[in-house]
Amino acid sequence: MSLPEIKYCPGTLAEGHSTYSRTCLNRVFNGHSVQHVLPYDSPATNQETDDLFAENRKRISISGVQEKFSVLLEKNKLRLINEGEHGAYILKPIPGAGKNADQMPANEHLTMQIARQVYSIETAENALIFFKNGTPAYITKRFDVKEDGSKWAQDDFASLAGRTPQTHGEHYKYQGNYLELIELMKVHLPAYKLEAPKLFKLLVFNYLFSNGDAHFKNFSLLETPMGDYRLSPAYDLLNSRIHIEDKDFALDDGLLPRSQAKGTVLQQFYLLAQHAGLSEKQVDDILKGITSGQNKVASLLGASFLSEKIKLNYWQAYQTRLKKLTQIHNAI
């Protein structure tokens, strides 16, 4: 694979850039003039590269099925961490399994950019980056790392719920329903009323963009400079249907406990919002915002690094979900 011709910023997807735009460099790389090409071939390219990534693989402690590598920024260069070092970035190459696996980095990058640019959802800073052989990878800046290298405390919702593979089995991340996230926030977050609308908006976004892998570990609370907690920036957003045959929701019971999960998906969203203490106006405003922005979505999709075939699949999935939300919403 050769390096692609770059016409859009691989960070913001803004037109007219042959590498990262100044906006992207400021947001993602603290203003450093980082190149969009890494000084490595992709994993499994040759023995030397393989050994390098195998060493790094032992050092990263973030769980998940997709391989992730820890990277730090040294002057204007990104490199894999050495023993005893702590990375400020996570690098996610093309995974070794899954349908359309080569599209996963561009899928996650696009979905994260749509969340931020179209719907003003706070997200982890991110960009697309390329190995020397032209293979793409997704890179994201860790929001739990301070400027001095120390860490903000972060608790994902599986930890808050006391769920581990030992206590709840291998499927622990996917058990239950999204109402449980709301209830956990009420217990652990004094600023709950400020954060609940953000969580609700993110859940609607995940539905609209077919993110069927939004499990308990993909939501977190993050320590603030004041020493209290808030909902962390969104992360791991992508259209999972492009890669696996997925359900509408990651959690086994969907939005609500099975005893309450009646009616259309939109009626269930309204009931979930009621449990969360959101007013009808708040819900209407969130739904109105989330079901608008088609032109902006189309523009970012067109600028994205997805293949033309997958761009079409992505758009069709979005339109199908949008129709479900808008038709029913207009009827209520």
Would you name each region that the model predicts?
Residues 151-152, 163, 238-246, 277, ...:
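C-terminal regulatory or interaction extensions
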Residues 103-119, 176-243:
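Conserved kinase catalytic-core segment
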Residues 199-203, 287, 300-301:
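Short alpha-helical scaffolding segments that buttress acidic/His motifs in well-ordered protein cores
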Residues 194, 245-297:
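A conserved long alpha-helix in the C-terminal portion of kinase-like catalytic domains
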Residues 48-169:
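Conserved ATP-binding subdomain of kinase catalytic cores across diverse folds
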Residues 71, 115, 157, 213, ...:
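A residue-level signal for conserved active-site and pocket-lining positions in enzyme catalytic cores
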Residues 1-49, 55, 228-229, 298-332:
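Regulatory N- and C-terminal appendages and interdomain linkers associated
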Residues 132, 137-208, 256, 268-271, ...:
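ATP-dependent phospho-/nucleotidyl transfer catalytic cores
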